[in-house]
Swiss-Prot record:
Coiled coil (UniProt feature): none
Pfam families xref list: MFS_1
Gene name of the record: CTB4
Record's note on what induces expression: Expression is positively regulated by the cercosporin cluster-specific transcription factor CTB8. Expression is also affected by nitrogen and carbon sources and pH, and is also controlled by another transcription activator, CRG1, previously shown to regulate cercosporin production and resistance.
Family: Belongs to the major facilitator superfamily. CAR1 family.
Membrane topology of this protein: Multi-pass membrane protein
Transmembrane intervals: 72-92, 110-130, 142-162, 170-190, 202-222, 230-250, 306-326, 343-363, 383-403, 407-427, 456-476, 480-500
Biological role: MFS transporter; part of the gene cluster that mediates the biosynthesis of cercosporin, a light-activated, non-host-selective toxin. The perylenequinone chromophore of cercosporin absorbs light energy to attain an electronically-activated triplet state and produces active oxygen species such as the hydroxyl radical, superoxide, hydrogen peroxide or singlet oxygen upon reaction with oxygen molecules. These reactive oxygen species cause damage to various cellular components including lipids, proteins and nucleic acids.
Entry protein name: Cercosporin MFS transporter CTB4
Keywords, sorted A to Z: Cell membrane, Membrane, Transmembrane, Transmembrane helix, Transport, Virulence
GO-annotated molecular function: transmembrane transporter activity
C-alpha cells in the first residue's frame, strides 16, 4: 500500500505535472501502489479544499454585500426596464380604431395584432430567457433582450401593413420579456429575504404602472400631429435612454457565474487546476433546462393545487387589467361622447389604486400582516391582504359598470378605478409572493408557469372585451366579468385555512 500523501505532495499540483518533495513519501514503485497513490490524489482534489466559495459573510465579491445605494440603483434600473416593456404592451391599444381605419380591418384584428400578439411573445419569452440567465448570467440576456426590444420598435414606425406590425409586436414581446424573466433573480441575488420585502413591491408597482400609462400616453400621441407611428418612436427613444443611463451601473450578480470566474482566476494564478466552483461540478445540459423551464412547470401546474389556483386567479386579475384598457375608451368615448385623450384620463384612478396598494405592501412587510416563522405566522399570513384585494376588485368593477350610464355623473365611474387598481395589485403581488414562498427552490419553475398563463390571459381578454362590449355594452359586459372576480374570492380564503396542509402533501415541497 502506498504511503499517505502529504501537503507537500498536494503543492505539486500547482505545477504542470505532480511533483514530490524530498520530505514526502517516495513515489510508489509497484503498479498497485501507483494506483492507490493516484486515488488518494484524486480524493484530495475532489475534497472541499479546492472548492471555491465566498470567503465569509463580508466577502466583497458577494452581490449581497454591495453598497446599499448600489443595490437601489440596480433595483430602480430593473423597475425602469419593467416600466418601459409593460408600457409598450398596452400603448398601441390607443391606436386600435385609427389602425382599423387605415388598414380597413376589423377592430378585433387590430387588437390581436397590436396587443394580444405582444403578450403571446411576452408569454413565450421566459422559456428562452430563463435558461439563458442560468447559463450565461444575468446581465448578458438582460442587455440582449432589452436592446432587442428597443431596436424592434423602430421598424414599426415605418410598417406599411398590419402583418408587419403583428410580427414586430410579437418579437417585441418576446425580447421585452427578458427583464421580467430575470429581475426576480437579480433581486434575490442582491437583497436578503427581509430587504427584498421592500424592493419587490417597488418593482412590482412599476410592472402594474407601465400598462396603465400606456393608453394614457398613447391617446395623447394618436390625437396629436405626430400620429400613431410616433408611439413606436417614443418607446424606442425612452428605451434607449434608459439603457444608456442604467447599463453602466448594472454588474453581474449571478453567484454561480461569479464563483466560476473566481475559480478560473485562481487556476491561472496558482497553476492549480483543481480549483473549481460548485456550478462547474454540475454543468447543466439542454435536458436540464428543458426539465426546469418546460416539463417541470407544466407538471407543477397540472398537479399542484396551490400553483394552479393561484396562477388562475393572478391570470384573471391581470387579464382584467388589460380588459379595462378597452372598457374605459368604450364607455367614455362611445357612451359619454368624450374625446379620446380626455377619455383616457380616468385610467389614472386605477394607477392611484395600484400605488396605494404598493405602499400598503411595503408598510406591511414587518407587520403582523407578513409571514414570520419565529412569531408563529405562517406563509398563509400574506393571504390576508390578498383577501382584501379579492373583495376590492369586484366592488370597483360593479361600481364602474352600474355608473356607466351617460345620464349619470361621471365621477363615481371615474373613482371606481381606485378600488379596482388596489385589488388587482394586491392580488397579483400577494399571489406571486405566496407561490414563491410555497415552492422556494422550485420557485423559478412555478413562476415560469405563472408568467406563461398570466400573459396568455392578458392576450385573450382584450379580444374577448372587444366583441363582448360591442354585443352587450359596458354595463353588462363588465358586470359579467365582475361576477367572475367574485367567483375567485374563495381561493385565498381556502388556502389561508388549508394551505399549510396542502403544501405538506406537495411533491415539490422544499425540505425544511
Amino acid at each position: 500500500m502506498a504511503p499517505p500523501i502529504t501537503d507537500d505532495d498536494l503543492d505539486g499540483l500547482k505545477q504542470p505535472y505532480v511533483t514530490f518533495s524530498s520530505g514526502s513519501a517516495s513515489p510508489p514503485r509497484s503498479t498497485a501502489e501507483a494506483m492507490d497513490f493516484e486515488e488518494q490524489i484524486l480524493e484530495a482534489i475532489k475534497s472541499d479544499a479546492f472548492l471555491v466559495d465566498w470567503i465569509g459573510e463580508d466577502d466583497k465579491g458577494n452581490p449581497q454585500n454591495l453598497p446599499y445605494w448600489r443595490k437601489w440603483v440596480i433595483t430602480m434600473s430593473l423597475a425602469l426596464y419593467a416600466l418601459s416593456t409593460t408600457f409598450s404592451s398596452s400603448v398601441f391599444g390607443a391606436a386600435t380604431h385609427v389602425l382599423a381605419e387605415e388598414f380597413a380591418l376589423p377592430a378585433e384584428t387590430v387588437v390581436l395584432g397590436c396587443t394580444s400578439l405582444f403578450m403571446v411573445g411576452f408569454a413565450t419569452g421566459p422559456i428562452f430567457w430563463g435558461p439563458f440567465s442560468e447559463a450565461f448570467g444575468r446581465t448578458r440576456p438582460l442587455l440582449a433582450g432589452y436592446l432587442g426590444f428597443a431596436v424592434l420598435q423602430l421598424p414599426i414606425a415605418d410598417a406599411r401593413s398590419l402583418t408587419s406590425i403583428c410580427i414586430l409586436r410579437f418579437l417585441g414581446g418576446f425580447f421585452g420579456a427578458a427583464p421580467s424573466s430575470i429581475l426576480s433573480g437579480i433581486l434575490a441575488d442582491i437583497w436578503s429575504p427581509r430587504e427584498r420585502g421592500f424592493a419587490m413591491p417597488t418593482v412590482g408597482a412599476f410592472l402594474t404602472i407601465g400598462p396603465i400609462l400606456g393608453p394614457l400616453i398613447g391617446s395623447v400621441l394618436v390625437q396629436s400631429v405626430l400620429g400613431w407611428r410616433w408611439i413606436a418612436n417614443v418607446v424606442a427613444i425612452a428605451s434607449f435612454l434608459i439603457a444608456l443611463s442604467t447599463f453602466p451601473f448594472l454588474p453581474e450578480t449571478y453567484t454561480p457565474l461569479l464563483l466560476a470566474r473566481r475559480a478560473e482566476r485562481m487556476r491561472h494564478m496558482t497553476r492549480n487546476w483543481a480549483y473549481r466552483s460548485k456550478s462547474e461540478e454540475a454543468q447543466s445540459s439542454i435536458g436540464d433546462f428543458a426539465e426546469r423551464y418546460l416539463l417541470r412547470p407544466a407538471r407543477m401546474l397540472a398537479l399542484e393545487p396551490i400553483l394552479l389556483m393561484m396562477t388562475l386567479y393572478v391570470s384573471v386579475s391581470f387579464g382584467l387589467l388589460y380588459n379595462f384598457f378597452l372598457a374605459y375608451p368604450t364607455s367614455f368615448i362611445q357612451e359619454r361622447g368624450w374625446d379620446q385623450t380626455t377619455a383616457s384620463l380616468p385610467l389614472i384612478s386605477i394607477l392611484v389604486g395600484a400605488i396605494i396598494a404598493g405602499a400598503l405592501l411595503s408598510f406591511s412587510t414587518n407587520s403582523r400582516w407578513a409571514p414570520n416563522a419565529k412569531e408563529g405566522r405562517p406563509q398563509e399570513t400574506r393571504l390576508l391582504l390578498m383577501m382584501v384585494g379579492a373583495v376590492s376588485l369586484p366592488a370597483g368593477m360593479f361600481l364602474f359598470a352600474w355608473t356607466s350610464s351617460a345620464t349619470m355623473n361621471p365621477w363615481p365611474q371615474i373613482l371606481s378605478g381606485i378600488p379596482t387598481g388596489f385589488g388587482i395589485h394586491l392580488i397579483n403581488m400577494q399571489g406571486m409572493n405566496y407561490i414563491i414562498d410555497s415552492y422556494k427552490i422550485y420557485a423559478n419553475s412555478a413562476i415560469a408557469a405563472n408568467t406563461f398563463l398570466r400573459s396568455l390571459f392578458a392576450a385573450g381578454f382584450p379580444i374577448l372585451a372587444t366583441s363582448m362590449y360591442a354585443a352587450i355594452g359596458v354595463k353588462w359586459g363588465t358586470t359579467i366579468l365582475a361576477l367572475l372576480a367574485v367567483a375567485m374570492i374563495p381561493i385565498p380564503i381556502l388556502f389561508y385555512y388549508f394551505g399549510a396542509k396542502i403544501r405538506a402533501k406537495s411533491k415539490w415541497q422544499p425540505p425544511l
